[in-house]
Design a protein with these regions (language model features):
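Glycine-rich loop(s) and the adjacent beta-strand/alpha-helix scaffold that form part
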Residues: 347-350, 354-419, 606-609
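Active-site- and interface-proximal helix/loop "cap" or "latch" segments in soluble metabolic
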Residues: 24-119
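A glycine-rich dinucleotide-binding beta-alpha-beta segment and adjacent secondary-structure elements
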Residues: 331, 510-593
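Conserved redox-cofactor binding core of oxidoreductases
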Residues: 233-350, 370-371, 522-541
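Helix-rich C-terminal "cap"/substrate-channel and partner-interaction subdomain
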Residues: 83, 88, 463-547, 613, ...
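An anion/pyrophosphate-binding glycine-rich loop and adjacent beta-alpha core
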Residues: 201-213, 392, 396-400, 404-508
Length: 619
C-alpha cells in the first residue's frame, strides 16, 4: 500500500511538472535628467526577457532627442539589454535614457548587470542598383530624393547617423524667400532698412555684381514708392542682401539662382505638408523675408524640427526612395571619368555598394570637425559648435579624392546666440522679433540684427565674451520656441528689469536704464546708438526673461565648387560627369558670411536642382 501511495504521488508530481509555471512579469520606472527636462523610462521584464520599454521626455528636442527615445527603446527590446549605443547626435538624451533604464530595472527589483550584455550587430555585405544615390539625409539630401523620385527615378539615401536631419533639423529660424504671397500679408514698414542698404552701396563701388544689383533695386524701390501696392521685396534685393552679407565674395550666379527660386521652393514644400507662412525679420535682411512655421495656436516654432520629420515621412512613404541609416559613405565609384556609385560601411562593419547612374553629395559641412576648423581658421580653436556630430567634412574629402575643387574653405561662420552651457542654438528670429542683447554691465553694444559676423565680433569683445538675450512676456506668448527654452532651463526671469538684473548678476539700475531707453527708441522707430532699423514692439510686458549666450561655430560657407546645375567641378574647372552636390557641402553661395534663413533657402533650392539634374542625367 505504501509503495502504491508513493507511486501515485510520483505520478502526480510528474503531471504537475508538465504544466508550465506562470510567467513572472515585473515592471519598473526610472527617471533621469535629459536635455530639456526629465526623461522617464518604464521597462517590463517577463521571465528574464525585456518585453516592453517606453521612454518619455516631452521636452527633448523634436527630431533629435525624440528619435533617441524611440530608437534606444526599440534596441533594448531587440537585444534584451540596456547596454545599447548612445546616439552621437543626441548624447545628453541618450545618456539620460540609459541612466533611467538602469533605475527602472532596480525599481523592478532586478539587477541591471543581468541586462547589460553587449549585442554585436551582424550583417552581410550588400549591393544595390538604383538610378540615383544620395549621400546624406539632411534637408538637401531629402529634398533631392523627393525631387528625383517625382521624375520616377529609384533613389537610395545613405545616412551615417541613426537619425535623419544633419544640421537641418537643428535649424531654428526659417527660410528666406523673396516676393511671396505670405509677404503680402504684412504691412510694409521697412523703409529704413531698404534705404540703409542702398546707402551702404558706396562701400562696394568696386564690386560689379553689387553695383548692378544696387541700380536695379534702386529703380524698383523708386517705383514702389510711387505706387506702394503690396509688400516691397524682390529677387534682386534678396541677392543684394546676400552679396553684402557675404562681403561681396559670393558666386553671383549661384546667389541669383538661389534667390530666384525661393518663392517656388516655398510652394513646393507644401507637397510635403510643410507650410512656412509667418514672415519676420532676420539679421542682414533689408525687409521681412524669413518664412517660418507656426503651431496650432499660431505661435512660431523651430523650422528644422518642423520640416525634417515631414520630409522624412514623405521619403518613407515614397516607394521609389530607400533610406539606409547608420551607413557611412567612404568612396565615390568612378567609371570612365564619371561618378557611378558609392561604397559605404554599414553599422556592423559590412560593405554596402550602391551602383547608380548619378551621385548626389549632401553630407553637410565640417562644423563638427573642430580639428579641421582650427586648421583652416586657427582663431576658432576652442570654440563650441552648434553642429550635428556627423558634420565632419567627409563628403568634401570623398569628392576631392576624385579630383573635385573646393572654394572658400576658410570661411567659417560663428553665431552670436549659442546657449552658453549647452551649445544649443538660440534662434536669430528672437532678435528679429524685438529682442535685445546686453553685456555683463547691462548695456546694449551692437545693432542686434546686424550680420552674424559683426554681432559675434562685438559680443566677443564684451566682458567675458558673452551677452544676455532679453525678451518679455509678450514675446513669449507668441513663441513656442521661447516656451521651449524655458522648459529646457535656459531662461532666467524677473518681474521687473531690476529683478531680472539681480537674477542674472547684472546691475539692475543699468539694465533698467538700458531697457527704458530701448523702449523709447522702439516708439520713435530710431536707434541713435547703433542704427538698428528693425524694432517690432517695446519690451515692456512683465515678466522679463534673459538667456545667456555666446558665440559658437555654426556654418561652414566653404565647400565643393559647383555650377548653377549643381554639377561638381574639378580643379581645372570642368564638370565631373554624374556627380552633383547640394547644401552645406558646397561653397561659393554665401561668401564670407551666411545670412540667417539662407541655409534653408540653399538646401531647398539647390536640393531640388540636384534632384532634377541627377534624374535627367540618369536617363
Amino acid at each position: 500500500m505504501k509503495i502504491r501511495f508513493i507511486a501515485l504521488l510520483t505520478a502526480l508530481v510528474m503531471m504537475l511538472g508538465m504544466v508550465p509555471a506562470m510567467a513572472e512579469t515585473v515592471t519598473g520606472t526610472g527617471t533621469a535628467k535629459g536635455f530639456g527636462g526629465d526623461v522617464t523610462v518604464t521597462i517590463t521584464v517577463t521571465d528574464g526577457k525585456i518585453t516592453a520599454v517606453t521612454a518619455e521626455g516631452a521636452n527633448e528636442t523634436q527630431g533629435i532627442g525624440s528619435v533617441a527615445l524611440e530608437n534606444l527603446s526599440a534596441a533594448m527590446i531587440a537585444g534584451n539589454t540596456i547596454a545599447v549605443d548612445a546616439m552621437a547626435t543626441a548624447t545628453i538624451t541618450s545618456n539620460a535614457i540609459l541612466e533611467a533604464a538602469k533605475a527602472a530595472l532596480v525599481a523592478a527589483g532586478l539587477n541591471p548587470d543581468d541586462f547589460s550584455a553587449k549585442v554585436e550587430a551582424v550583417a552581410e555585405d550588400a549591393t544595390y542598383d538604383v538610378d540615383v544615390v544620395i549621400v546624406g539625409a539632411g534637408g538637401a539630401g531629402m529634398t533631392a530624393a523627393l525631387t528625383a523620385a517625382e521624375q520616377g527615378k529609384t533613389v537610395i539615401i545613405l545616412e551615417s547617423q541613426p537619425i535623419v536631419g544633419g544640421n537641418s533639423v537643428r535649424a531654428t529660424g526659417g527660410m528666406n524667400a523673396a516676393d511671396t504671397p505670405a509677404q503680402d500679408t504684412n504691412t510694409f514698414g521697412e523703409t529704413a532698412g531698404v534705404e540703409k542698404t542702398l546707402a551702404s552701396l558706396s562701400t562696394y563701388a568696386d564690386n560689379e555684381a553689387i553695383v548692378k544689383l544696387g541700380e536695379t533695386v534702386k529703380a524698383q524701390w523708386d517705383a514702389y514708392q510711387a505706387n506702394p501696392v503690396g509688400y516691397f521685396d524682390s529677387v534682386e534685393l534678396m541677392e543684394l542682401d546676400t552679396m553684402i552679407g557675404g562681403k561681396g565674395i559670393n558666386d553671383a550666379e549661384l546667389v541669383h539662382v538661389m534667390a530666384a527660386n525661393t518663392a517656388a521652393g516655398i510652394e513646393w514644400l507644401t507637397t510635403a505638408d510643410i507650410h512656412l507662412t509667418n514672415v519676420g525679420s532676420f539679421g542682414g535682411a533689408s525687409v521681412k523675408r524669413i518664412h517660418r512655421p507656426v503651431d496650432g495656436q499660431g505661435k512660431t516654432v523651430s523650422v528644422g524640427s518642423y520640416m525634417i520629420p515631414r520630409m522624412e515621412t514623405a521619403c518613407k512613404n515614397n516607394a521609389n526612395i530607400t533610406l539606409l541609416m547608420e551607413t557611412t559613405a567612404n568612396t565615390i565609384l568612378m567609371k570612365d571619368g564619371a561618378a557611378c556609385g558609392i561604397v559605404a560601411t554599414g553599422k556592423a562593419g559590412n560593405t554596402v555598394t550602391v551602383n547608380a547612374k548619378a551621385v548626389i553629395l549632401a553630407t553637410g559641412g565640417f562644423g563638427a570637425n573642430l580639428e579641421m576648423v582650427a586648421e583652416l581658421k586657427p582663431e576658432l580653436k576652442g570654440f563650441m559648435t552648434t553642429n550635428a556630430a556627423g558634420l565632419q567634412g567627409q563628403g568634401i574629402a570623398m569628392a576631392e579624392a576624385v579630383g573635385a575643387a573646393t572654394v572658400d574653405m576658410n570661411q567659417i561662420q560663428i553665431h552670436p546666440t549659442v546657449q552658453a552651457d549647452t551649445a544649443a542654438l538660440i534662434t536669430e528670429g528672437l532678435r528679429g522679433d524685438g529682442a535685445v542683447l546686453v553685456n555683463a554691465e547691462g548695456k546694449r553694444f551692437i545693432d542686434e540684427v546686424g550680420t552674424r559676423d559683426v554681432v559675434s565680433a562685438a559680443e566677443i569683445a564684451q566682458t567675458g565674451s558673452y551677452s544676455w538675450l532679453i525678451v518679455d512676456q509678450a514675446m513669449l506668448d507668441k513663441s513656442s520656441v521661447i516656451a521651449g527654452y524655458v522648459k529646457k532651463g535656459f531662461v532666467f526671469s524677473g518681474e521687473t528689469y531690476e529683478a531680472l538684473g539681480a537674477a542674472i548678476g547684472v546691475d539692475g539700475a543699468a539694465l533698467t536704464e538700458t531697457m527704458n531707453t530701448w523702449n523709447g527708441y522702439v516708439e520713435a522707430k530710431n536707434d541713435p546708438d547703433f542704427g538698428r532699423t528693425s524694432f517690432a514692439d517695446p519690451l515692456n510686458t512683465a515678466p522679463y526673461y534673459a538667456i545667456k549666450v555666446t558665440a559658437g561655430i555654426h556654418h561652414t560657407m566653404g565647400g565643393l565648387k559647383i555650377n548653377a546645375q549643381t554639377q561638381v567641378l574639378n580643379t581645372e574647372g570642368n564638370v565631373i560627369p554624374g556627380l552633383y552636390a547640394a547644401g552645406e557641402v558646397t561653397g561659393g553661395i554665401h561668401g564670407a558670411n551666411r545670412l540667417g534663413g539662407n541655409a534653408v533657402a540653399d538646401f531647398v533650392v539647390f536640393g531640388r536642382i540636384a534632384g532634377a539634374e541627377a534624374a535627367a542625367y540618369a536617363n
